[in-house]
Amino acid sequence: MARNIKVEELFQTPVEKQRIELVERKGIGHPDSISDGLAEAVSRALCREYISKCGAVLHHNTDETQIVAGRSSPRFGGGEILQPIYILLVGRATKEFEGVDLATESVALQAARQYLKNTLVNMDLERDVIMDCKLGTGSSDLRDVFKRDRIPVANDTSFGVGHAPFSELENLVYNTERQLLTDLKSRMPGIGEDMKVMGLRDGEDITLTICSGMIGRYIDDLDSYINMTQEMQTYVEEMATRYTERNVKVCINTGDNLKTSSIFLTVTGTSAEMGDDGSVGRGNRCNGLITPNRPMSMEATSGKNPINHIGKIYNLLSTQMARDIVKQVPEVQDVYIRLLSQIGKPIDQPLVASAQVIPKEGTSFAKVKAEAEVVMDDWLSNVTKITEMVIKGELDTF
């Protein structure tokens, strides 16, 4: 059956040439990102358990994880958690299959604890966190939709969007958080995982505003704190030259009041310890960024089942499509993908698969159109590859 693929030329100024561009990334220790990470870790653990016990991934969604902030008393050289962070793992899961009972809650709790251990290395999971799990069973009609055919059918009428390539600012914002928490943190453990990077490009001038929670046990006093933020600033300024030739100004923790020693200091490295709650889907999109200059889906990707949940599959698929179009069709300057499903219809047959293309100057759109259609059709023909990549941990969701 022919697919409803529509490729059109988009007549607008490419993002890279627009006057104002905004890009945000919430770091892996931001409460919203923690929620995303927990939800996805639980989903992937359930997938592995279902495959091990039942031979197939069964219906589940764990995309409602909530974090209720605790209370803390950070200080230089230490600090303590006064009230633990409360984490509620919420969703739906298949708990019995053909007479086999499945320990879904135990699997979920184990996966969540392991994710926190790997992500927030300064958190004491015995003292600092209360973990709860409430997984209900899925509705019978959706479970039926889940298992009808070889090609899964859509669980909902919904859409996913993606774009490529990243702009200079998008690359810079994404890699600033990644490099600070992988490279610099290995030498400067006082950098907390709770970080937000906000990028503004005004013409040829870029401002990066970085809000980074510092960990008190590794910092002796205010002077040490100031030195650390200055070293971070220098690191980012030097790193930025690898991503752009534009002017870059770096600002660290602009909310600090050094006169009163009111600074972003934490015990564990996340503001979830003191007043900052978290929810799935309130942070980064599945490409790792929040990009108001681009079309975005408001739907959470993390925690949704990777078999037929359009909120997950089509957002990931559209992003992969866009990236491959840019790789394989070098005449494309910007491409935006939109995929729309109908509930109960095969996910390889979207109601529409739309590509909006801004070709490079002097390029034949007819050539671009034909080559983009081939990439899109190939991905739709192999749509279940997205499921495999998710289960293997090859695709990020935030």
From Swiss-Prot:
It catalyses: L-methionine + ATP + H2O = S-adenosyl-L-methionine + phosphate + diphosphate. This is S-adenosylmethionine synthase. The gene is mat. Its cofactor is Mg(2+). It is an enzyme of class 2 (transferase). The keyword Ribosomal protein does not apply. The lineage of its organism: Archaea, Methanobacteriati, Methanobacteriota, Stenosarchaea group, Methanomicrobia. InterPro entries: AdoMet_synthase_2_family, AdoMet_synthase_3, S-AdoMet_synthetase_arc. Belongs to the AdoMet synthase 2 family. Keywords: ATP-binding, Magnesium, Nucleotide-binding, One-carbon metabolism, Transferase. GO terms for biological process: one-carbon metabolic process; S-adenosylmethionine biosynthetic process.
